[in-house]
Structures are given as structure tokens and as C-alpha cells.
């Protein structure tokens, strides 16, 4: 394996991590060698690089060495294709048949294309088979499953190209579809679009073109309950149900990613794919939609309202598309943004009623679809009008808390910080930059190269200094005094100039301008001042503006308030201002970005539903709560023995003494084997398939076990008392051989208040936010401890002596929430208990306080992947997020647009994870650490991380080019990107950022969405905020919530009520119709409805109220009225009532 290029300091860091990892593996192997687990060793193989990950994930021996050899001379994609052909030709690995070799070839190629991280190669590809064409030739079919989605569109499409490349190598012909098969594809994809979702839906012509020309048969296993109506029972298609995997690969893979496939086809000179040219000319990727249009010869960014679709009640809209008052784009990267995370002022988070907290996802207009939110207090906050009429900008948290109850209207919600790299990643044209300080300072330096600059002073100059600099250096007006002139028109500008000229009163020293309040309001000029974001105060009957001289000069007035112009000669107001003012005024906020709330941030323990402490099956013996204590005392009837329970469990046999049982180890000390039999023939067979009928064999059956004895022995063996508040198991094991977990582990988990996941590990989920730099003070760790962890110098090379110094975060170090830290602390205590009481070895952590767990090793894992990443805990945050280096998130194949992942204690994974517990179903191996990446190689992480910019400032040419909506690729060579540092020591070190933030956890601790109670309360808060924000149209929000959330919900619940099944409260048996006896025929329990009247009607009254209050369209009102009638007719008692004489009087 080629050595990763890193400095001595970074190599020492990696060696420290790997040394601790080796120590923990040795401890676990020693503990597991005592025979108390399904395997006597650690079950998570280690991988130092992509080649190792692919080999461990797919299980084809010798692949790793071949990958390393191929990557020396080829690109990743070319190497994947070559690798597939080598495997298919039998040069690597051993296979029983040609179809098996082709299947393995496709799997290893897809694994390589997805960095050996995602589960798609093992879960998303069901199998490959060889079929017959009508002319007698053979063709290859690839059967895809739902989890292929996690591979991404490009890898999905490339898997088909791999299949073609491989089948040529082994001499198999192309697929020749029948006419009815082509029509079946068309019907099926259109049906899949209705029942699920597709990022891109190809037209019928495009589907026909792909199926008729694709050399591989794209098949799949059935994933949806819906069946096709026409083109059924086809000979070469096994099912009439919808095949989701096939639809994804054809639509989101081949159709959407055709240009990328064509590039590889041309590079590799593969014939037979010429039809891609025809497909590309007819397909327009959703990511390549028209972003800019010509207006008067100038390019312009068009508003996009896609993010506004499917609005959910309780999750507010912060700005309609590109509307004045919405988020103002500011280019730059803070130490906690980039990689799809954006920064906003923490003061803005508070002023907007706490709906946004660190980690909250926002659906955004551009450059991508969504962004995780991070607090950045070095950018501008919201500008608000208070109840007393004052207009001020709130930039600090203290101000926000003090004034938020007085806010009458949010005129402007502030800036949003988005880095250049996110525009490059999304291939989004560079929207015009606002005129900001980092642009102005470069123009200042260019005009005065010999002048010493004091940035702190120049950031907040006085009005006199700002005007003097304009005149002396001939540079544009400072951003502090540049107002939003592009938000008003020529007539408003003229009226404002006239008002100030006639009625304004300027203090002698020019420090204040006073205007008559009532006249300013009556003429509409107060609103114009608000639109311009001119801050002012109301003092008695006067409106007072501080430091008014730049405003006065921008209006073409002198210091006597005399107007020096009569008319405006240009249509564009800024052109007129630049002519009249005598200095240049640049656009202050040319780009607004619309946004609404997506998912709230998350920091919570991972629980299955319901949450068990132990993976031990007890069927119905534990009742609805799955209580293991209840199961230990369960009686089938009054005469039966307590605790003898019938469960479905795996039968195992000891190869040494022949004793049968269900445990993985026999009393004689030998490990047991599954006792396989054919469920159809009933014969014992020691093979995966029955030789008689070819059915899959199994070892599971219903049997009675003495659970009470197991339960008591478990408590006794670890010296614990049976006094647990709650102790839960599972009804049934989902694993292949249904081998239960030792009950002792569950007892100790319950003791420490922990819950197990499907693989025997304890997890904690957190929203992903990037972090490249830290201050020891903000993560709750002393300088001394940071030095022990290897943080010796700050980003300027100075020795670490102060907890406020900024340090470059090492790539595998994590900062987790305090709540997560408490949970991890309990896990360390559980592991120590387990080592001492169950394995009878020495404790490892001895942690009593969260300070004791700083430096412990963790493992990060994303839900759609099967590869864990080694990490180290170095600090804590009050925010409900998990902060980690972008490389760490990218290694899990995640970005930070609102995704959430889990961390687990490394020792817990090593000690308790077992493949024997994983569910034996599609997707069962996803979200399981089947391999562990020990060292992060930036060249092998998700390529999105390569587009992150690491510079301290953006060049002047960048800001200027954005005014012409430049292509982001034009600056790839200019910007300091990760991609330009790969293969050098700088790929790990000397990162910088353009905007600092004083505290990465500033802002609300939790989103209001999580703290508000009912959905009605959330909805009320959402609409109140909509009324408060100038950039939001509250009636439109109300209409959208009704049509996309409440109405579909009510219709769905009404339909569900009429089709519902009934349920027994005692044994949970379900019935299609209520039993005639009114009680459960199985246990005699009470039978109840599963959908109740309250659930159907819960949104009706609130919908009627919203429709009236916000005057929604008459069509929506009528829909609400009609569904009200439906509910009334369904639930109202139709019995005739006795009427008296008085009823007619």
C-alpha cells in the first residue's frame, strides 16, 4: 500500500490513534477468547485504504492488491471497469459459475466507485444472471434492489457500463429486448414515480431509447406492493410488482447521468453506446436547469421555488424566492461552514423565534437543495422595526434576547454565508456578490498599496473617513454606508431626496439628520428608508438618522441639503446614483436566497422501535412492553411451569458432543453450528440449499425454552440484583440463524440506561456540521489537555498557551454535544462493567466524569453505509450537533446539508458487534460496521470534500466576476481548494477560513419546532413568524400548508378509517374485520379500532380557522368544506330522535 503523504506531526497523530486502536483490539480479543460471544475475536476488519475496504466489504480475496496496482496508472472509474473484467475472467477470486463471477465483478466495481463505504454493492445488487435472447444468444441481467439508491446516480449508471464491459470480456452477447418488455419498462417507471419518488423522470421516448439500446438487461427484485396493469406475466420478467431498483438505475442513473457515462465511454473507447448522444440531446438534467436569463443584455439569476414545495406545518418559511428582505448572500467560509453547511447570524436565529438552531436544516433556493445551519457572528444579523418605530440591525445575541419581544417586523433577515466550493460542487453559476468589506478592503489596498492597513478600524469607519477615502482614493463607498438602492425605484429615490431636501434638518457637525415623522410616514418614505436598511430612531415627532452624510451625498444633496440635480437619465437607479453622487456606489445585496425550515437538528440516543436492552427473543411472553421480567414469570396456562416460553429460535448442534441447543457455545466449550434442515422436505441438510427441492434451508423453528432459568442464571453470573426499572427484549430475532445475544449484556445495558441497536451496539445520533478549527475554551477542554492530545500550536504557528487561540482541527477528531457525552460516559461505564463482571478481565476506561472521556476512540457510521470511520473525542458543545472535520463526514459518504449520523464507542463496537445479529433481509447489512477505516486519506473520501476552499480570503477578481454570473469552474485554478492540495502534506494542515465566529454553539440550544407542543401550536408559531417577516407572504404559506400537509393528511386518514383493521389490546393480533363475538378469538382480549375518530378530525377545525383568517383561495376553502361534510356523514349518529310538540312551536 502506498504511504499517505503527511507531515511528521500528522503521522505521529495517526500512529497514536492506531496504537490506541491496537491496544483496544488486543483487550477485546482477550475478552472474546473466553467464548462468550458468537466469535472468539473482533468481527470488524480494519481497512487502511479503499482497496482494503472493497475486499473486506465484498469478500473477494486478492482484490485489494489488484486495485492498488490499477490505481497507479488509471483513474478511479477506469480502474473500476478494468477490475470488473479481471474478476469476471477469473484472474482474481474463485467462482463456481460464469454468472457468479459476473455478479462478483459488478459488486467489486460498484464498491470501488463508492469508495468501499456504502452498502449498495452488497444490498443494492441482488444478483446477476445469464438469460437467453430470442436468437439463442446469451445476455446478462443485473437485478437491482432499493438500497442501490445509496450509491448515487453516477455509480448506478456506471454499474451498467461495468456489466457491459464485463460481459464483453467473457464473450456474452448484448440484451435484445422484446417489444412487450420495452412497454413494460415504460409503464413500470411511470407507476414507480406515482408510488415513490424520482429525482428525474425520463419521458416515454427516453425510456424506450435506453431499453432498446442498453446492452445489459436492467432487472430488479419487487420492492413495491403495486402491480403493473398491462404487460403482465412476461416470460423473462419474474414479477408483476414494481421493481424499485430497476426504476432508480434507469431513471436516476442512465437517464440523468448520461453525460458522465458518455465521458467514460469515450475515454475507454467502448462501442455500442453511441445512443447516449441522442439521449443527452433530449435530456436536461434537473441540476442543469436554466439558471440565468438575459435581461437588457445582462445575465440575471432567476428565482426558483422548488424548495417551497411540500411545505409542512410548523416548519416556517423564512423567505420567498429571491425576495427583498430574504437572506442576503455573502461569499466566504467560516470554520463551521462549507460542505453544504451555511452560516447565519446567531442573533437572527433568536429573532426568528428560535426556529433555527445550530444544526437545523434549511431547504434553500440555491446553490444546493438544502443546508445545515451554523452560527457565524462576524456576518450581519437581521434588521428589524421595533414597536416604537425604531429601525435597527441586531448583530449580537445579547441584543437579540433583549429586543426580540419588541420586534414588530423583521425587515431583513440578515446575511447567509455560503462558500465558493458549494457553488462549484453544485455547478451553479456564481450569483452576484454583495458589496462587502472583504471586497472593499482589496480595492482599498489596490488604490493605496503603500498605506499600512488597520482592518479593525477600517471595518467600522466614521462617515467622514468613508467619504474622504472615496474622494482621495477614488474607491467605492464603504459597505457600512452602502444602502440597498436596488430595492427601490427612481420615483422613490426622487421622493426621498425631495423630502430630505425640503424637510430635513441636519446637525451642524453632520452627526444627525432629523425628518418630520408624520410627513415621512404619510409620504411612504419611512418604508423606503426601511427598504434601504437605513437605521433610524423615533424621538418624539422626529425621525433621526445617525451618520447621515453618506446617505445625503448618495441622494445627490450637499451638506446644505440642496438638491443638485433635476431629473434622472438612466433606468437603473444605481447608474443614476453613481452619476449624481460623485463617487461609486456598488450593489449592497444583489442576491437574495429563499429558505424554509427542513428537519430540526438532532442529538439523541439511537433507539429501535420499541427499544430493547437485549437481543433476546421472548415472543408474546413479555406482553406489549417486551418485558423480560414478565417473560421469566410467564405461564401459558395455570398448570404450566412459570418461565417456560415458546419462541422461534435457531437450533444449533455441537460438532464435538452432538448436544443440541440454541446457544452459540456448548457447555463442553466447543462452538456450535446451525442445524440446517429443509422446511419443505423436512430433511436435515448441511448445505444452504436442499439437494432435493432446491429450497433454502433454515435452522429456525418454534421451541420451548426455560427462560426463567436463563434469566436467573444471567443475573447470578454477573452478580447483579433483579431490581431493574425496565428490562426489555425483542419478540423475534431477525438474523439468519436467530442466535440470541447473551442476556448478561442486556442486564448491564439496562442498569446504565442504554439501549441496543440491531447489531448489538449502542449508538448516539447527531446532525452533521463541519468544523475545521477550534478554540479550546469553546469545547470545554484545557490547554494542557489539548497539548497532551497533540495540539501544540495555533494556526499562526504560535505555541498554545491561551484557550482562546484558534487551532486547526485534526481530521479524525470529533466534538460532540454534552448530552452525547453523558451517554458515551455511561457506555464507558457499561463496557467496564461488562469487562469485569461478564468477561472477568480488568476495566479499561475507569471514567467518572465527562472530562475523563476526552481522548477516547469512537466510531462514526452513516445509515446508508457499511463502513465505520475511526474517530477521537476531543471536546464538547452545547449545540445539538456532532462537529467533525469535513473529511470525516466525507469518509462516511455524507455532507452537511442536514444529514445525521451516529457515533458509537469504539470498544463497544469491537466487543459487542456481531454479524450473527444482523437482520437477514434486504438492507440488513446497511448501517452496520462491516469494516473500519482507520486512517483518512483525503484522496479516497467523497469527492465533494475536494471542492472545499481553504483560503483566508477570496481574490478581487472573484467578486468582480460574480457580477457577470461567471461559471464557478473558471476559478478552480485560482482558489485554494482541497483538490489542489491532494498528495501533499498540506492536504491535512494549514487550512484557513475567511470569516471567524466567536462561538460554534451560539444561538438557541434547540429549535422551537422541538420545544413547542402540539402541531397546532407549531402551526400558529409558523404563521405568526410569517406575518412578522417582510420577505414572507403569510397567506401563501397558509395555503401551501393546507394543500400540501393538512388536506392530504385528512383525506388519507379518512381513507385509512374506512379500510382499517382491528387489534386485540392483549395479544396485539390484527383482524381485517371485527370478530362477531366482539372479543379476540385467540386470547379473549378486547378488540379495538386502529384508527380513531380523533385522528381523522384533528386538523379540521384548525384548517377552517386558517382558511378564514388568511383568506386562502375559494377552491381550498371548498375542499375543506367538502371533507368536513364527509367526516360529518361518517361520524354523525344517523338514528332518528324522538321529537316533542315543542320542536314544532
Swiss-Prot record:
InterPro entries: PolC_DP2 (IPR004475), PolC_DP2_cat_dom (IPR056172), PolC_DP2_central_dom (IPR056171), PolC_DP2_N (IPR016033)
EC number in record: 2.7.7.7, 3.1.11.1
Catalytic activity: DNA(n) + a 2'-deoxyribonucleoside 5'-triphosphate = DNA(n+1) + diphosphate; Exonucleolytic cleavage in the 3'- to 5'-direction to yield nucleoside 5'-phosphates
Molecular functions (GO terms): DNA binding; DNA-directed DNA polymerase activity; single-stranded DNA 3'-5' DNA exonuclease activity
Residue ranges of coiled coil: none
Keyword Nuclease among UniProt keywords: yes
Subunit and interaction comment: Heterodimer of a large subunit and a small subunit.
Primary role: Possesses two activities: a DNA synthesis (polymerase) and an exonucleolytic activity that degrades single-stranded DNA in the 3'- to 5'-direction. Has a template-primer preference which is characteristic of a replicative DNA polymerase.
Protein name as it appears in the record: DNA polymerase II large subunit
Gene transcribed to yield this protein: polC
